[in-house]
């Protein structure tokens, strides 16, 4: 027979026992919590990079022959790289996948809200 490991602590006359299952649930909750912070950190990083790259510094250009600065197109290149290498391990891929995940989460929340509204409407019609 396999023994389940338990930890215990005493308080007065009562002994409290916590099982491994409760500890595993706490670990899962911690993982979800920290994963949310990582996603938010990546989202802010992407937003900051976008803000930096969208403004170009063409003030040094003296005539039309100098043309636009090259860093204007660098943001597009990163986005294309993210789309082309979806299964790769690049940083832009992580940003891309988080944007898609965030969009899907938003859609899921919207669908749940719509479902709840329709359920409430059907309940109110049944009561009348």
From Swiss-Prot:
Main localization, broad class: cytoplasm
Region (Disordered): 1-26, 54-128
GO cellular component term of the entry, any: cytoplasm
Residues spanned by motif SOFL-B: 59-68
Gene Ontology biological-process entries: cytokinin biosynthetic process; cytokinin metabolic process; cytokinin-activated signaling pathway
Biased composition (Basic and acidic residues): 80-104
Keywords from the UniProt entry: Cytokinin biosynthesis, Cytokinin signaling pathway, Cytoplasm, Nucleus
Location relative to the cell: Cytoplasm; Nucleus
Residue ranges, compositional bias (Polar residues): 8-18
Transmembrane intervals: none
Free-text tissue specificity from the UniProt record: Expressed in seedlings, roots, flowers and siliques.
Residue window of motif SOFL-A: 11-16
Residues spanned by motif Nuclear localization signal: 111-118
Domain description: Domains SOFL-A and SOFL-B are required for function in cytokinin-mediated development.
Similarity field: Belongs to the SOFL plant protein family.
Function: Involved in cytokinin-mediated development.
Name the UniProt record assigns to this protein: Protein SOB FIVE-LIKE 3
This protein's encoding gene: SOFL3
């Amino acid at each position: 027979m396999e023994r389940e490991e338990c930890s215990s602590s005493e308080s007065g006359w009562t002994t409290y026992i916590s099982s491994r299952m409760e500890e595993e649930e706490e670990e899962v909750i911690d993982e979800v919590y920290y994963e949310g912070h990582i996603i938010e950190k990546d989202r802010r990083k992407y937003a900051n990079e976008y803000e930096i790259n969208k403004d170009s510094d063409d003030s040094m250009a003296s005539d039309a022959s100098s043309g636009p600065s090259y860093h204007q197109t660098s943001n597009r290149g990163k986005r294309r790289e993210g789309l082309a290498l979806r299964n790769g391990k690049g940083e832009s891929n992580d940003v891309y996948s988080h944007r898609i995940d965030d969009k899907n989460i938003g859609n899921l929340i919207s669908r749940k809200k719509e479902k709840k509204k329709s359920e409430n409407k059907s309940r109110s019609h049944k009561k009348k």
